[in-house]
């Protein structure tokens, strides 16, 4: 699962990035309105954590852009503006949740999991495809009653495909979704093919 953090305060941005990376999310960051607008235009995310008070623009305008582009990312506003009016405005403009600062990182993580469950449509804690069951909260995968031992990237690839049944997935899009910014460092897609080969072997 891929998350974009839009936050201009360096220490908070770094803390959120490290915490969410430990939760096995692919995490990218932007510290300005301009940088965030470029990332949102060029890439897709599962969830965006959006500060609305940015040095070069209002985060609510980014929310507006997402809706105009018919993007389907889940949006959690994180803001020091905690009045009822601010919360209502953010939610009415399309945010999925509104978390006032300061907040506990455990609560942030719980809210991310909650909006991602809602994004899947049924709000369930597991994803079932035939005899394959994925439990995103614990990163566990079962075929029938047998639990599979998957590496992190193998799990990420499987989860990406499982959330897009009957879709043709471009290898560049898959690499960017699973490896994030680091996908640009590769000259070819051998690393993607290698992980997929291992995954197919384990699923067989």
Model-derived features: positions:
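N-terminal/domain-start alpha-helical segments
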Residues: 1-122
């Amino acid at each position: 699962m891929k998350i974009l953090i839009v936050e201009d305060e360096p220490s908070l941005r770094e803390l959120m990035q490290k915490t969410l990376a430990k939760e096995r999310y692919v995490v990218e960051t932007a510290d300005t309105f301009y940088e965030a607008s470029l990332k949102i235009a060029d890439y897709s995310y599962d969830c965006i954590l959006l500060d609305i008070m940015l040095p070069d623009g209002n985060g609510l305008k980014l929310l507006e852009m997402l809706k105009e582009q018919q993007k389907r990312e889940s949006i959690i506003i994180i803001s020091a503006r905690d009045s009822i009016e601010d919360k209502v405005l953010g939610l009415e403009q399309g945010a999925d949740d509104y978390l006032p600062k300061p907040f506990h990182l455990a609560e942030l993580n719980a809210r991310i999991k909650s909006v991602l469950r809602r994004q899947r449509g049924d709000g369930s804690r597991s994803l079932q495809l035939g005899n394959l069951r994925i439990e995103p909260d614990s990163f566990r995968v079962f075929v029938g009653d047998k639990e599979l031992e998957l590496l992190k990237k193998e799990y990420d690839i499987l989860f990406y495909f499982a959330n897009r049944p009957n879709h043709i997935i471009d290898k560049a899009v898959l690499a960017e979704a699973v490896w994030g910014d680091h996908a640009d460092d590769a000259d070819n897609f051998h690393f993607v093919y290698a992980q997929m080969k291992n995954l197919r072997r384990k699923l067989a």
